[in-house]
A protein has these predicted regions:
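Secondary-structure transition/capping motifs at alpha-helix termini
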Residues: 121-124, 279-284, 305-309
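Pre-Walker A (Motif I) flank of P-loop NTPase domains
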Residues: 201, 206-207, 254-260, 284
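Conserved RecA-like ASCE P-loop NTPase motor core of nucleic-acid helicases/translocases
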Residues: 268-271, 275-299
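Walker A/P-loop
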Residues: 254-275
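Extended, charged low-complexity regulatory segments
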Residues: 1-242
Length: 310
């Protein structure tokens, strides 16, 4: 990869790291808005919640002042969770248990250990907190230990210890992580238990494109090799398209990998609809991804008009 392409590639990696702003899965800050701190939850309420995986916030936080703050932060987390799910299809509400602090190593990260997907369900003036699915180990912790310190975390054993415990932030979990990372004594293993909005999608994206390929280099340099196509190929499209749009559709039908940069109002939505129609005409399927649900909704009228038998 050329120097210019590598610089562009590194810039893209930095942009991916910044997706969504500060990420509690890479640097947990317990003082931010939209975070319910359960580290000092009432022992009885926490014990019942640990067994049933459901509980009212009022039972978990019984001090009036602390409960008022927890209720306010739960409302913020709920609003943000609903917005991210509606607009981007992301489920972002998690219980985070335990943390590893890397800051003594001049690495600005405080990474939670275990994630457990959660729900906040309105119950009158209160919220019911519910845990769903199974807990997972934070991918950011696994990858940071592997690439920064050559430590392979025993994920199955860690999860087994966690699920067998009667606590949501058990000493056995913290002790096991300390044992696994004993080659780096500067690491600080901390007991934390919070509910907040988080997603590990940027982490997976970042490491998924760690090794650039020819497509990445073409995108980074803007230099695309000549493509040889059958000039007589005329795609079957359901709506009008100019010459450039037709070329894009033709390249899709030829199975090429490429990106198109355009401005709003230049017909990109209709071009996508034409691509879907052309693929349908060849009995092919297509998966359409978009950063916002609104973008997908804009395609619906075209589908109703051009693809009534979908």
């Amino acid at each position: 990869m050329s120097d210019s392409a590598n610089q562009q590639f590194q810039a893209w990696l930095e942009q991916i790291r910044g997706i969504g702003g500060p990420n509690p899965l890479t640097n947990l800050d317990t003082e931010v808005a939209g975070l319910v701190n359960l580290e000092r939850a009432h022992p009885v309420g926490l014990s019942l919640f640990t067994r049933s995986h459901r509980g009212l916030l009022a039972n978990l936080v019984r001090d009036p002042i602390s409960y008022s703050k927890a209720l306010t932060e739960a409302k913020r987390a709920k609003i943000k969770s609903d917005r991210l799910e509606a607009n981007f299809g992301l489920e972002t509400l998690y219980l985070l248990a335990g943390a590893v602090d890397f800051r003594h190593l001049k690495l600005d990260r405080r990474i939670p250990i275990v994630l457990w997907q959660a729900e906040l369900i309105r119950k009158g003036a209160d919220f019911e907190l519910a845990l769903t699915g199974d807990p997972i180990v934070n991918p950011e912790l696994i990858l940071t230990l592997k690439y920064e310190f050559n430590i392979n975390l025993d994920v199955p054993r860690l999860l087994r210890l966690y699920t067998e415990s009667t606590d949501l932030a058990p000493i056995t979990l913290l002790s096991f992580v300390a044992e696994q990372t004993k080659s780096v004594p500067e690491l600080e293993i901390q007991r934390t238990l919070v509910v907040t909005n988080a997603t590990y999608a940027p982490t997976l994206m970042l490491h998924d494109i760690k090794r650039p390929n020819s497509l990445v280099e073409e995108l980074a340099t803007g230099v695309v090799p000549d493509r040889h196509h059958d000039k007589d190929l005329i795609p079957l499209i359901p709506a009008d398209a100019d010459q450039e749009q037709t070329q894009v559709i033709t390249r899709v039908l030829n199975g090429e990998s490429f990106a198109v940069e355009t401005l709003p109002g230049t017909g990109y939505t209709q071009t996508v609809a034409n691509i879907l129609g052309a693929l349908a005409g060849e009995s092919k399927r297509a998966l359409v991804l978009a950063p916002r649900r609104q973008t997908l909704n804009e395609l619906v009228p075209y589908e109703d008009t051009y693809l009534p038998l979908r």
